[in-house]
Amino acid sequence: MRHRVLIADPLEETGTALLREVAEVTVRPKLSEEELAQLIGDYDALIVRSGTKVTRRVIERAARLKVIGRAGIGVDNIDVDAATERGIFVVNAPSAVTTATAEHTFALLLALLRKIPQAWQSVREGKWERTKFVGNQLQGKTIGIIGLGRIGTQVARYAKAFGLRVLACDPFITEERARQLGIELRELDDLLRDADIVTVHVPLTKETRHLLDARALSLMKPTAVLVNTARGGVVDEEALYEALVQGRLAGAALDVLEHEPPKEGTASARLTQLPNVIVTPHLGASAKEAQEEAAMEVAKQVLAVLRGDFPTTAVNLPAIPADVLHALRPFMHLAERMGRFLSQFCQGRVGEVRLNYAGQIAEMEAEPLTRAFLKGLMEMRLPETVNFVNAPALARARGIRVVEERHLQPTDYASLIVATVRTHLEERSVAGAVFQGVGPRLVQIDGYRVDVAPEGHAILVEQIDRPGIIGRVGTLLGQNNINIAFMQVGRKEVGGKAVMVIMVDTPAPPELLAQLRTAHDAILDVRQVDFGPPLPLSGGMP
């Protein structure tokens, strides 16, 4: 059955056409919350821009929804927490609008400093007032950038080209990265005091709402100007209005407001009437090239999720560059199968998960691997949908302690993942590695060396290493028409405990497992595991 995609805001035809190649696409712009809530239950994917609000109420009605795509950067119109709780990917198109928004930032800044809108209006009125509109140049000024994401970084590059001294405030940027960009990192208060121009490039969150309030604005020079092409709520507009009216700030250029369009009586509306303020109607991403790129980018991300692949721009997952994802993908498959194995091999309530990443894999991003393991561990035990998005939250909600460890020193393998699960009854472990040209393999079960492809059905026999067990087990399986594809025994010493792994073409029924447990007095226990279908040779999300 073809996937169904609902597009609830205008989207460039390039993106729509790409979606139509593999999915049934419905375009319904300007839906109310009630209308969207009524429709959403029939769709696998939803694509919006900034106009449509995807609320918790809508998401709770989305029985089939796998992904919400935002054709742009900001996702404050989407209840990301609600989507995450239900295991719905939220993806955006961050790279598509970077250039357009950064360019618009400088368009506003230059227009503000050179008083271009006011001069143009004067000319339209038949005047030619050269001396009235003397402005300021950029070169030699200091610009303070709040937020060094994609757009903030691009603004920094443009600022350097204009001959500006660049300050920046971002808690996630290292000093080394700042030096590479040729900028100076500052705390917010210091940046506000020193900058001639302050420009905002952070998302609107609980932490950033009214980040620039009355206190923060009071730190700025009276000759300074403010530019905001991010989100209106980041700036306290009442405080901004007062600062501008009282001459404590020279001017502001705004592409975003708290109320869009401005509502009468609000600070948003009053700001539009000030002579030292320039306002554009949220045009940062409104370049034809940017819209086409955003449509294509979000369409590709949505299709990646629908075909079971891993999106690279999910906002409710750690961002993973494409090259890193390519390197991690086989280990993600391995981690997911290891979790799936321990979910069935362990008995009792899971209390703790310990993941040890050793060798080369220890130098890479671990969170996607941990998410993959938790997905495999919980998806067969829980009634709700478990995926990469909600697996950590589901583990936390159940009080499962997750511990990650890294060991960079070499092991017997280039990279090794060791997973240990502790329940209220027992502790079990499994280790896995990825081999070039072969793929993922389990290499240890409870410390016993094995070499098992984590695919299909497996019967695990815990035993004392004695003669005759393989024959008894093989005979019983044959008598019950269970074909053995592969068999291996892992042991530490002759005559000691051992584990036998038997890969079978079809699962054994419960009554046969019971017979196997009593087939020999040296058999300690018998358990069965469904690893899942064969792994793809490349690509695809576990």
Question: Model regions: which residues?
Answer:
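An N-terminal-biased, well-structured beta-alpha scaffold segment characteristic
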Residues: M1-V91, D213
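Residues in the short beta-alpha loop(s) of Rossmann-like NAD(P)-binding domains
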Residues: L11, F172, G490
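Rossmann-like adenosine-cofactor binding region
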Residues: T52-I59, P171-S268
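Phosphate-binding beta-alpha-beta segment of Rossmann-like dinucleotide-binding domains, i.e.
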Residues: R86, P94-T142, R150, Q154-A161, ...
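Rossmann-like dinucleotide-binding domain for NAD(H)/NADP(H)
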Residues: R86, V90-V91, A214, T223-F345, ...
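Oxidoreductase and adenylate-handling cofactor-binding alpha/beta cores
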Residues: A102-Q121, K141, R157-L164, A243, ...
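A conserved regulatory-domain signal marking ACT and ACT-like small-molecule sensing domains
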Residues: A319-P542
